[in-house]
Structures are given as C-alpha cells and as structure tokens.
Amino acid sequence: MQAVDFNSDMGEGFGPWTIGDGVDNELMGYISSANIATGFHAGDPGTMRRTVERAKALGVAVGAHPGFRDLVGFGRRHINASAQELVDDMLYQLGALREIARAQGVRLQHIKPHGALYMHLARDEEAARLLVENLRVIEPELLLYCMPGSVICRIAQELGQPVIREFYADREYDLSGSIVFTRNVRGYEPQAVAERVLRACRQGVVRTVEGQDLAIEFDSICLHSDTPGALDLVEATRKALDAAGIVVRAPR
C-alpha cells in the first residue's frame, strides 16, 4: 500500500462539554479526513462550525457523522426506529453540516454513520438500501465510509454510490470480518496500535479476537478521538506510516 486515508471522529462535544480527552484541535493535524458530529449523538451548530473551520485551515477533508437520536448514550445505544425514520434523521443531519460547511466554502467529501447506527446499517438491508437510494438522488458523488463486506457496502457498490472501506485501528475484529462493537472503550498501547496498522497496510491482515489472522482490504484507517489516549495513538500511527513511506491523504 502506497497511500491511505486517515480519518477520525471530530466535534463530539456538546456546548461546554467534551468527550474523551478533548484533543480534537491537536489530533486534527495528523489526519486527512474528519467525520464531524451532526447534533443527534453529539455536536451542536457552533461546534460543527468551529470544527469545519479547523479542518479547512489544516487542509483536512470534511464529512458528516450522523448518529441515532441519543445524546445521553453518545449514539452507542440501538434505537428501534423504522428505516424511513432513520434515513429522515440522517438526511436532516447531513443537510445541517453541508450548509454550515458551505458557508465556509467547504464541500463535504463523505458521510460516515456513527456508533450503533454504523453497525445497524452494516447489517440491516432495508435501512441501508433506503439511505443509499437517497444519496444517489441528493449526493451521488458523496463518499460513503463503511465496513468492508457489510450490507451497506455491498448495496452502495451495487447502486453506484462510491465507498471508502475502513480499517479500525482501535477496535477488535472477529472472524466474520466485523468489528466487535463496545460501549466501554479501553485504552491501547500506542506502539501496538501503530504496528497493527502497519501490518494491515503491508500484509493485508489483522489479528482477530479468536487469535487468527483475517484478510482485510481497506482505503481508510479510522482511529477514534474518544479512545483513551487518542492523541498518542494517532501520533504514533501517523509517524509509523510516514516512516514506512505510506502517504496519508484524503481520497479526494
């Protein structure tokens, strides 16, 4: 692998409150794409605007990061809603960030659902298809960040919506190829995460929770800003990529 995108979730505070270590400003200097929270699981209009401004200043690509209506649970709890309700909510959030970004002269590069909604769309045919069908109408060139081999990835490829397949640096995988979703995120050793990423980039494999290697193809590395010690993890990973001659750049 000669080049890869490096993305992280940004703007996931709310008013005066922050999530994780509160290191968005510093972390932004190491990534190429920012997934900006759009108000339902975290974020607010002012935070969205400031995060777009910071990304623009650093040349970081911007994407919408819509979630379930779950501020209290940070979007990590599943909400039992119809496919139409979920897509209505996602389009609402997408539109909000799109206009805030447009006011700054920034065009959205991508959309990446958050947390439990990301996992729901990875498995639910009806909601995934309805979202992609709507994206084909309103934003046919918008990149859709998703898990390789997931339901939404397959549907997007089938319908012609461009996809960016992700590798999660700070989440565990099982042999099905899925990340192991958790509400209780633990810390990681920076060097171990960096080595895991380099192994995925060079060899195309990741060690699963079952203790076996899983082949994986991806276009972007994700490392979450709310993971404990996120700044150290991102810094170590970026330095390792640079030292290996792997160029970090946004897909567009």
Curated annotation (Swiss-Prot):
Catalytic reaction annotation: 5-oxo-L-proline + ATP + 2 H2O = L-glutamate + ADP + phosphate + H(+)
GO biological process: carbohydrate metabolic process
Pfam families, sorted: LamB_YcsF
Family: Belongs to the LamB/PxpA family.
Protein name in UniProt: 5-oxoprolinase subunit A 1
Quaternary organization: Forms a complex composed of PxpA, PxpB and PxpC.
EC numbers: 3.5.2.9
Function: Catalyzes the cleavage of 5-oxoproline to form L-glutamate coupled to the hydrolysis of ATP to ADP and inorganic phosphate.
Record keywords: ATP-binding, Hydrolase, Nucleotide-binding
Record-level Gene Ontology MF annotations: 5-oxoprolinase (ATP-hydrolyzing) activity; ATP binding
NCBIfam families assigned to the protein according to its UniProt record, in alphabetical order: PRK05406.1-3, PRK05406.1-5
